[in-house]
Amino acid sequence: MHESIKIHIGRCQMFLLVNIIGLFIFLGIGVIFSRNRKNIQWKSIFILVILNLFLAWFFIYFPWGRAGVKGAANGIAWVIESAHEGTGFAFKSFTSNKMMDMAVSALFPILLVVPLFDILMYFNILPKIIGGIGWVLAKVTRQPKFESFFGVEMMFLGNTEALAVSSEQLKRMNEMRVLTIAMMSMSSVSGAIVGAYVQMIPGELVLTAIPLNIINAIIVSCILNPVSIEEQEDVVYSIKDHQTERQPFFSFLGDSVLAAGKLVLIIIAFVISFVALADLIDRLIHLITHLIANGIGVKGSFGLDQILGVFMYPFALLLGLPFNEAWEVAQQMAKKIVTNEFVVMGEISNQVNAMTPHHRAVISTFLVSFANFSTIGMIIGTLKGIVDKKTSDFVSKYVPMMLLSLIHI
């Protein structure tokens, strides 16, 4: 018994050591590909890393932190129950079965959550929350005010929505700061989509992952694209002076519901299309490798997950996972980058509770963001409609760096 305890402690210490080494390697990769290594503000990076580690400890191990996250997750679940009531009123058969389809259980609640967030925006409640958290984050991390505010905006609004809301600010910023914002946008998550996430993986993991990913995004952008600004440039421009006349509430609410409906249809279309395309490519690769294997007298084949998993495997190992779990996570990470988070969440939703705590935390943190190939197109497209051609072309030139930030996130 004592021997087994010693072996378990030894393994934990080894994986913790690998985790620490992995942190330095990830930071090192960022430094190698940095646009301006001399300008990296290591004091801010150190503060951000410590803050991230503290939040991870607080939310996962500290009783008050765990209780807070659990309470918030239960609150979201309570709101989702109202969403299911709305779905059940229109489609009773959809919600009568405990095993609801993914679209019904995860995506239909968006029809409630998006208008709910928009109502909070309409009455200026959400902007005040964003401003307060952003101000604290800017003071603690010593980052420019807008970059900190934008990190919090992403946590509630999502990438394209946060960019659209911040359009006046982006028009006044230099191209290097806009690139920083584009890189940060790779790690965004929309508060309106959180309701969908918590239907597929435990809510406490989702809510823990969101702030960690936002801080990770700031760390990555500070290393890959360090920018120094003068004090007079560190200004957050108000959008109130540029707003059109305020819509009547029910007209605004109607537009919000329509936007939510379009969002649900878009996500369903993306999920169906990406799953189908990924499966087709996987089948073709299996067929080709099977024919090659038969030609050389070997049995077996491999597919898309295995190919992409090989590339992601070293990164998964550096996260302190055992070899077998690292291989599984590597394939899931690769599939999420190529398709989207909903595809992988749907696959692991029935397995996540059986995973080891560290395995569960790693995969949940990676999945809870919009970071994938299609996100790059969305960000570039949104920026083209906001900033001038010179700035959008500058950002487009650094797509490889955005891809690198995607892997770091």
Describe each region flagged by the PLM:
Residues 214-263:
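Long, contiguous bundles of hydrophobic transmembrane helices that form the permeation core
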Residues 84, 88-143:
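Hydrophobic alpha-helical hairpins/lids featuring a short glycine-rich hinge
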Residues 258-351:
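Transmembrane helical segments that form the transport core of multi-pass membrane transport proteins
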Residues 22-33, 48-60, 108-119, 188-196, ...:
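Hydrophobic core segments of alpha-helical transmembrane domains in multi-pass membrane transport
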Residues 407-409:
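Conserved small/polar residues in nucleotide/adenosyl-binding loops
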Residues 65, 82, 124-126, 239-255, ...:
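Short, membrane-interfacial amphipathic segments enriched in basic
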Residues 1-3, 8-68, 243-272, 283-284:
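Hydrophobic transmembrane alpha-helices of multi-pass small-molecule transporters
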Residues 140-198, 330-399:
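Alpha-helical membrane segments and immediately flanking helix-loop junctions
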